[in-house]
Amino acid sequence: MAFQQSSPLVKFEASPAESFLSAPGDNFTSLFADSTPSTLNPRDMMTPDSVADIDSRLSVIPESQDAEDDESHSTSATAPSTSEKKPVKKRKSWGQVLPEPKTNLPPRKRAKTEDEKEQRRVERVLRNRRAAQSSRERKRLEVEALEKRNKELETLLINVQKTNLILVEELNRFRRSSGVVTRSSSPLDSLQDSITLSQQLFGSRDGQTMSNPEQSLMDQIMRSAANPTVNPASLSPSLPPISDKEFQTKEEDEEQADEDEEMEQTWHETKEAAAAKEKNSKQSRVSTDSTQRPAVSIGGDAAVPVFSDDAGANCLGLDPVHQDDGPFSIGHSFGLSAALDADRYLLESQLLASPNASTVDDDYLAGDSAACFTNPLPSDYDFDINDFLTDDANHAAYDIVAASNYAAADRELDLEIHDPENQIPSRHSIQQPQSGASSHGCDDGGIAVGV
């Protein structure tokens, strides 16, 4: 006790539970005021209720039940105490008023005496009450959040149900307006995927009418009120599968038909081209050329007159030539047909009686045709073609030359340029060499062929 009196005075807090410094034996003010009632309602110590809080959520333990529990605990505790005389810890009821501690023991100091232990017990009860209150508050907030979420989900579910009902009503109205027979609505209609087919989808395919079993099945489905769902595959006409061999045969037939059509078209084009070519060759055989104007010089100063128009041809007894027969006319430059026609001209006009064309100094004229060449008009020309026609030799030569012209026209020989120095001798001895050429070679005089 002397130690307690000699200890220095220290200023303490009002409550020993919240104080860090305390001296044993010091007297402190009571934790609970004198005005504190002997009985305390536990709800008075709790935090204020929230706005959303409902009284029915929290159940209050009746005091009568607490009293009965206390009595039961006391009876159970007194029975062994009387027999064994051993103190048993008595558990205080919830919400019981705590006694005032007699000591002010520091928090970190171990309690040794009964008063100090009582102080620790009171501090522990207060600490537990605060923890329980915070736990209840946290739980209340969580419950409120869950209730709010539940209300939102309920509202969303109600809206979805309303929308579903509206859609079902619209679907039924559309079915009634379209004439599709449907069964009576039930609460389970929204959970079923109903597929209805209109009557227009079941028309005949490719002009073929459905058989009687299929028609009866169709009528039964359309008139049935119990099963609106129809499998389209069961209503379509059955088609046998096509084998690969038949498919390949069909493709081959199509390809063969295309090839035949192309070959027929090519044959027609070739036939038309051959007919046109034959027609042109026939026209070339009938006509002769007199529109060209050749100028031929045969050795030295002897020259063959130039025909300016058809008058010269008429003077010689030749027929006029069409424009299409130009390649086979006399005056075509550097052509085989032109050379053959020049020889025919020499024979028909009887300018040279000798087959040797290089002997130009001698006059082998069978008749006097100077008047025709000086004035090659048809009025001054007195050559008689009948004299030539009666000549057998000249007539045979004319046939040979004409045959060669026809052969050249049929074979459609290409026009070639003949060198006057290198001439190929004629196959027929009676045929004259080409104009401007010699059977033995070049002459001393200038030999030229021009237009």
Swiss-Prot record:
Region (Leucine-zipper): 146-153
Amino acid composition bias (Basic and acidic residues), ranges on this chain: 112-126, 265-281
Annotated transmembrane regions: none
GO molecular function list: DNA binding; DNA-binding transcription factor activity, RNA polymerase II-specific
Entry keywords, A to Z: Activator, DNA-binding, Nucleus, Transcription, Transcription regulation, Unfolded protein response
Region (Basic motif): 120-140
Induction, as annotated: By the unfolded protein response pathway. Accumulation of unfolded proteins in the ER leads to splicing of the hac1 precursor mRNA to produce the mature form.
Compositional bias (Polar residues): 27-41, 283-294
Residue ranges of every copy of the bZIP domain listed in the record: 118-181
Acidic residues composition-biased segments: 251-264
UniProt GO BP: positive regulation of transcription by RNA polymerase II; response to unfolded protein
Function description: Transcriptional activator involved in the unfolded protein response (UPR) pathway. Recognizes and binds to the UPR element (UPRE) in the promoter of UPR-regulated genes. Increases the synthesis of endoplasmic reticulum-resident proteins required for protein folding as well as components of the secretory pathway.
Protein family (similarity comment): Belongs to the bZIP family.
UniProt name for this protein: Transcriptional activator hac1
Naturally occurring in which organism (per UniProt): Hypocrea jecorina
